[in-house]
Amino acid sequence: WRTVTALTLHSGLGHLAGNVVFGALFGLFAGRILGSGVAWFAIIATGALGNLLNTLVLVPDHRSIGASTAVFAALGIVAGYVWRAKLMSQERWVYRNGPIVGGLALLMYTGTGDENTDIGAHLFGFLCGFGGGALLTLTRDRILEDRWQWLGGGGAIAIILGAWGIALLS
């Protein structure tokens, strides 16, 4: 549950504002491709998975807070989906791999900062999102159906509420 609740905690208004702005932007892009419900389910799920991997790889006392893992998961979802679905021209190397290069460039430009920046969380969020986005291409004929959008959106809300319910009862 901590991998999910950490996505909703922030160290201050500046931290929150940055995650809201970039989260809304990358979330909008993911929603345009996958539909809003499926996109937000994928963002929450791969963001939580990124937090889990970050925790497993880093020292045991590492603490990670903020939605930035999910923000970079959203960026990874878009890059992975566009790359795997071959939505870009496949004629030249630069076009085929443009989504990967573009995603990594945005990760490097926006995902690094001062000493308080959790670069591991950003990287694992992006990688988990990329994998999730690539996997979602296998279902692209169905994911835009209303029932999957409702299930995805409801599932995203249920994951967050469930994690907080467990946290408050612990």
Predicted regions and their residues:
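A detector for small-residue-rich transmembrane helices and their helix-helix packing motifs
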Residues: 1-170
